[in-house]
Amino acid sequence: MGPEALSSLLLLLLVASGDADMKGHFDPAKCRYALGMQDRTIPDSDISASSSWSDSTAARHSRLESSDGDGAWCPAGSVFPKEEEYLQVDLQRLHLVALVGTQGRHAGGLGKEFSRSYRLRYSRDGRRWMGWKDRWGQEVISGNEDPEGVVLKDLGPPMVARLVRFYPRADRVMSVCLRVELYGCLWRDGLLSYTAPVGQTMYLSEAVYLNDSTYDGHTVGGLQYGGLGQLADGVVGLDDFRKSQELRVWPGYDYVGWSNHSFSSGYVEMEFEFDRLRAFQAMQVHCNNMHTLGARLPGGVECRFRRGPAMAWEGEPMRHNLGGNLGDPRARAVSVPLGGRVARFLQCRFLFAGPWLLFSEISFISDVVNNSSPALGGTFPPAPWWPPGPPPTNFSSLELEPRGQQPVAKAEGSPTAILIGCLVAIILLLLLIIALMLWRLHWRRLLSKAERRVLEEELTVHLSVPGDTILINNRPGPREPPPYQEPRPRGNPPHSAPCVPNGSALLLSNPAYRLLLATYARPPRGPGPPTPAWAKPTNTQAYSGDYMEPEKPGAPLLPPPPQNSVPHYAEADIVTLQGVTGGNTYAVPALPPGAVGDGPPRVDFPRSRLRFKEKLGEGQFGEVHLCEVDSPQDLVSLDFPLNVRKGHPLLVAVKILRPDATKNARNDFLKEVKIMSRLKDPNIIRLLGVCVQDDPLCMITDYMENGDLNQFLSAHQLEDKAAEGAPGDGQAAQGPTISYPMLLHVAAQIASGMRYLATLNFVHRDLATRNCLVGENFTIKIADFGMSRNLYAGDYYRVQGRAVLPIRWMAWECILMGKFTTASDVWAFGVTLWEVLMLCRAQPFGQLTDEQVIENAGEFFRDQGRQVYLSRPPACPQGLYELMLRCWSRESEQRPPFSQLHRFLAEDALNTV
């Protein structure tokens, strides 16, 4: 029997057994061999770095368990705060890297440098670099705790790479050194990337997210291209697609799926790019067939082939109709014979045979054509061509090269280790709860005996971060001391303020101010006095990007100070969760029962009319989706005018609460529904309806066709360039233009919407151009989900990695005192107006670091004339800039109300030109 006959027989056997297992599928658990740093298989010439402290700490000394030179690679520059120093390893060929090991500089006891955490970046072609992230989107990897020990970290998901860079991190200016090893195996299947439509969400009793969450390519217009993801990670899905082999992931994680209703063509088209010409024998696709929930095997597959990116598809496509036991609900691998066709690009169409197609892995059985020139060799190929059509897929069989070694054992994640870790965590949590209860009881006993003394002068400081919160309340004449108030030190008279030298010292002694600066290693400017005994940490209002409604009269938290003319706003309920569908911390206002229930009754929206377009943002317990509603005029429930032309869909934003949300999160979500139902203004997004009869809970609000104002303005040029240096000077008029009067019209609409919120005593707390939507004819509506979008993560300051605050838009009293009022919204409006006149070309205080912005808030508190203001935009007349400066007045009473701002922008602003 000749070789060709043997090959044909093998292919027939493979196709016949295709429904059982993935025969060509690799097991990532066995792909854990050391790749050559420690045993010097990787030569010194393939190890490089951004810099090194000296030749004795050069990159070649970064081998794990090696003591060459001074014992490790040490960068010349600081890794704090920019994190730009890196160590690079060139593997020369594509590898699947499943594990990394790190070590510090021990040098026989003379060294003490190591890196407590690091990031990874990798490349397959030397030009495009991707940052590695775990399955939950975290980039930072915990490193070493001492200079000698080796720490192994599993990479879940693994990465397919030729070049890998280690970026050490530090939380302060310090020396770091690193030794490393990579573990994995050669990536022999040759798949460089696959292109596919973005996976969708299936709504059953719970939401099943069938997206390719680890895809490392590009996503544009509902298409993923130029990367690899879950279809090539080696994880084969279970029979029940709602379950997963991975721990702590969402339902549907193992599968990427598409709904038949979203594809009028009746098929899903994918494209695969390989490193060189190959003769393809078969393709294996692991599919789900849980037909009781709508998942079906493909009805057939059609594949086309070509040898280069600019060439035409060759010959007739290979067609294969799938048979077998379609009634068996078990997941299976489907083998598609490819007849030995030679190509570097494949385009395959998978025909729908039911409501859903669900794939977990795609792999190919192929042989390299000997006369082909590799696309990845010692030198890098020309820039890859990314096809405009549907996605290529990556599924590979790996040939393991053990080099006489045994695979490295798993560093973490075994069931026994996880169980022990959980038990230890539970025990520690119980001990912590008991300790807190005893501590609280102890202080309550002390406070019950404390003198009820008060100050004549009020000082209130709130830092709006759950768990990192300061509350200092000193009110004249309270009937009883505030909760958890420490006894006043002896020697202070009961009705005299503590001896404070000046405002600067008072600020430096302010625990809230010190806490905001705690993440920086800069010493204080002066020795402030000891922290007063009455400065006691406690929890207060949590910050969110949503609206805050003041407490109704009748149950004030504390008596308002007599000298304060600004209406007193109640503290919000403490909600220790990172937002429901958006902001990292979310506060639901403390309202009497039924206080928000006086709006119109909520309207049940037909869930079936929503057609998903893209995900706008997400929070800990929910997401914000952009959807379309076809023929909205047919929905009688939408009883207010909708400016949608007949035959055109209506764009809506859908806030979705995940089924696994806590009870508190569900209550907060329903309370937000009630609050949103009260908002009826042409410049505020409106609640169109809700889906609360079953999970997932949804609220539907209107959305604007031109997206958010920040992106909209940044794509425009200023039409009138008479003002010297106006945004757009020196640039070719390539994009659309906008006039100065139209900018004023935009700002006037924002002021109008905020004027309406002020009449309800609502406080937005995150007013910015990213939270304004643009519709037809420059119609503006104020929204509230900008904080949930990763696009604007750089606009928010993280306090100890948890809460996020838009400090560049916040009034000084918000940053230092957590005091959010309509007057603080006026401050944010001034910054928003500055953004509008700058055409969103620059971030406010872009020349200042976050620390310096906080210090500038302190200068407003001290009021010694050293505070910094935003500069006048080039296109802004002096009269309008003076209005901005009034918005940034130190005293909140001196800031203009929104009614005055609206009147000026709508009627008088053009006269200031």
Swiss-Prot record:
Residues 470-499 are annotated as: Disordered. The modification Phosphotyrosine is found at Y484, Y513, Y520, Y740, Y792, Y796, Y797. Residues 192-367 are annotated as: DS-like domain. InterPro entries: DDR1-2_DS-like, FA58C, Galactose-bd-like_sf, Kinase-like_dom_sf, Prot_kinase_dom, RTK, Ser-Thr/Tyr_kinase_cat_dom, Tyr_kinase_AS. Ca(2+) 2 binds at Q230, D233, V235, S360, E361. Expressed at low levels in most adult tissues and is highest in the brain, lung, placenta and kidney. Lower levels of expression are detected in melanocytes, heart, liver, skeletal muscle and pancreas. Abundant in breast carcinoma cell lines. In the colonic mucosa, expressed in epithelia but not in the connective tissue of the lamina propria. Residues 31-185 form the F5/8 type C domain. The keyword DNA-binding does not apply. It holds the Pfam family DDR1-2_DS-like. Glycans are attached at N211, N260, N370, N394. Autophosphorylated in response to fibrillar collagen binding. Residues 21-417 are extracellular. The Gly/Pro-rich domains may be required for an unusual geometry of interaction with ligand or substrates. Homodimer. Interacts (via PPxY motif) with WWC1 (via WW domains) in a collagen-regulated manner. Forms a tripartite complex with WWC1 and PRKCZ, but predominantly in the absence of collagen. Interacts (tyrosine phosphorylated) with SHC1. Interacts with SRC. Interacts with MYH9. Interacts with CDH1. Interacts with PTPN11. Interacts with NCK2. PANTHER family: EPITHELIAL DISCOIDIN DOMAIN-CONTAINING RECEPTOR 1, TYROSINE-PROTEIN KINASE RECEPTOR. This is Epithelial discoidin domain-containing receptor 1. The lineage of its organism: Eukaryota, Metazoa, Chordata, Craniata, Vertebrata.
